[in-house]
Amino acid sequence: MIAENTTTPTFLVWFRKDLRLRDNPSLHAAVLEGCKILPVFIWDPEEGRQWSPGAASRWWLHQALKSLGSDISKLGGELILAKGKAAELIPKIAKDNGILKVLYGRTYDPPGLATQERVEEALDEAGIDTESF
């Protein structure tokens, strides 16, 4: 008899500008896979350097992350918050947690696209799948 692997895979959901649980394609895809979910938000100062957010935008981001963290906590999870280069932090968090796949919402602004490309390249080098929505 062959032993079945009962370990449930874990996917990392990288929250970017889609700071909500409802109507979130990345999160929805992870739920449909029936996997464990590791929710992560990275504040990457390099991505925002060209268009530095003002006080109102920073306030909104703080409130949105606070709300998202609270919603995730109510479901028994914890939102991981980190500051630094997403292309370094996402692969590190993924490797440290045995992540099989990283799911995220695409952005279309030039700095966001550049960050996406760097993150995808780093994850590809680490042998971790990505899927964007």
Task: Please provide the spans of the model-predicted regions.
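Trp/Phe/Arg-rich N-terminal binding region typifying the photolyase-homology
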Residues: 1-133
